[in-house]
């Protein structure tokens, strides 16, 4: 029936999104096989320059599928899910959804700051988890290369971040690389060693081999990736948005923030409407 067809579609969407990166998959499902997800080569996923034309084609395909479901034939729970998916679709149709203003890097919560934490806290439940973790370290140079290409394009388009933000990211990269000359004492290696010692998944010989592999990957992949990112950002320094008002003064700045308000906060009001509301106590309560 309609509920079964809709549930199959939702499960397919879930599979697609949760397998977009090994980090997402690992932190979402403890046992991917229980949801029919087979092991694959672990990667951080892709970072690409936004392409509105191809994205619109994808959204059209999604809309065709979603509107094919008869809402009144769905269960109450599935009706709510359909409404949420349609709301998300409307958000993604907004011009700001593919804006180059979206910034994966940042001085406080950027990818370069989150990755060491995500990798250090990566749970080792099975031998496959450890193999995936090591594959992720190997994939980091490719992933950071994609990030660098995106930042270079942002610079060419005049929407690269300002020097204050860049300096903060570079400082974080430098702090991460502080122990690069002694990888055996780096935080990631120390944490990895402690987790292996607490695990019963490997023999002593296998643990030692994992530690050797981990140390080599830090030296050959992880540290060079962070150096490359730092060097690339240094070369782009001074080419970012320096004007007062920041990104909101860019050509599509307001449309981007309107998209963020609707997609991340669930607020349908425009930035201008919110500004007016915030100027009055009653307006603030109305939110």
PLM segments and residue spans:
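N-terminal maturation segment of proteins
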Residues: 1-287
């Amino acid at each position: 029936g309609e509920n079964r067809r809709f549930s199959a579609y939702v499960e397919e969407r879930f599979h697609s999104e949760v397998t977009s990166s090994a980090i997402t998959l690992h932190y979402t499902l403890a046992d991917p096989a229980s949801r029919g997800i087979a092991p694959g080569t672990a990667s951080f996923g892709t970072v690409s320059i936004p392409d509105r034309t191809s994205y619109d084609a994808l959204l059209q395909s999604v809309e065709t599928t979603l509107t094919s479901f008869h809402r009144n034939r769905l269960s109450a729970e599935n009706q709510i899910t359909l409404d949420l998916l349609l709301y998300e679709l409307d958000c993604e149709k907004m011009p700001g959804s593919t804006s180059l203003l979206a910034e994966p890097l940042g001085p406080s919560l950027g990818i370069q700051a989150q990755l060491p934490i995500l990798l250090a806290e990566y749970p080792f439940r099975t031998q496959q988890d450890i193999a995936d973790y090591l594959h992720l370290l190997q994939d980091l140079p490719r992933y950071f290369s994609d990030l660098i290409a995106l930042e270079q394009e942002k610079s060419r388009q005049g929407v690269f971040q300002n020097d204050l933000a860049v300096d903060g990211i570079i400082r974080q990269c430098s702090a991460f690389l502080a122990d690069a000359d002694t990888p055996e004492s780096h935080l990631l290696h120390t944490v990895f060693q402690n987790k292996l010692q607490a695990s019963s998944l490997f023999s002593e010989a296998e643990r030692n081999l994992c530690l050797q592999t981990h140390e080599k990957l830090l030296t050959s992949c992880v540290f060079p990736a962070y150096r490359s990112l730092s060097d690339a950002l240094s070369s782009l320094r001074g080419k970012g948005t320096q004007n007062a008002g920041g990104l909101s003064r860019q050509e599509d700045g307001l449309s981007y923030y309107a998209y963020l308000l609707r997609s991340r906060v669930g607020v349908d009001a425009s930035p201008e409407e919110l500004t007016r509301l915030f100027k009055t106590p009653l307006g603030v309560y109305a939110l």
